[in-house]
Amino acid sequence: MSPITILLIGIAMSTDAFAAAIGKGAAIGKPRLRDALYVAVIFGVIETATPIAGWLLGQIASHYIATFDHWIAFGLLSGLGIHMIVNGLKNNGNTCKDNADTHNRNSRWLPLAATALATSIDAAAIGISLAFLDIHISIVAAVIGLCTFTMVIFGVMLGRVLGTFVGNRAEIVGGIILIIVGSTILYEHLSNNG
C-alpha cells in the first residue's frame, strides 16, 4: 500500500473525530490550546489502538477467508464509507457527539474516551480489513493516530467558528475516501489475478 493511500486512510478515519471535536469546541465556547491538546491526546491514543485491535482479530480469521479477503476489505471499506456519508447527510448540523458534560471546560476523560471509542469503531474495521493485506499495521495505526490528533486540535479550536458547517461535510468526504480506497484494493487484486 502506498504512503498516499495510508495517509488517505488516516485522514478518512479522523473525520468522525474531527466532527466530534468541532462539537466539543463549539460547546466549550472559547477553547484554549490546552483544551484542544487534552481532547486530541485522548482521541489520538484510542484511534491508534483500535485499528491494531481490529488487525489482530483479522489475523486470527485470515487463514479461513484468504480466497475472498479482497472482497471483505472492499465490503468493509465501502460499507463504512457509505455509513459515514449517510451519517454526514442525516445529522443536519448535529456534530456534537460528546453528549456527556460538553459544557464543562474541564470535562473528565471518561466521557471523552467514550466519544473517542465511538468514533473509532470504523478504525477497528479498517484494521480487520488490513489484516488481509501485506502491510505493517503499526505504520497505518500511527498515521491514523497522528491524523486524528492533528484534526482534533483543529476541530476543537475551530469549533466555535465553524460549528456545524464543516463537521458533516468532513464525514462525507471521509466516506468517499474510504469507498475509493476499498475500490482500489478490489481492482488491484482482481487485475493482478485476472
Swiss-Prot record:
It is found in: Cell inner membrane. It comes from Xylella fastidiosa (strain 9a5c). Pfam families: Mntp (PF02659). The keyword Kinase does not apply. The gene is mntP. The keyword Chloroplast does not apply. Its main location: membrane. This is Putative manganese efflux pump MntP. The chain crosses the membrane at residues 3-23, 37-57, 65-85, 112-132, 139-159, 170-190. Belongs to the MntP (TC 9.B.29) family. It comes from the Bacteria.
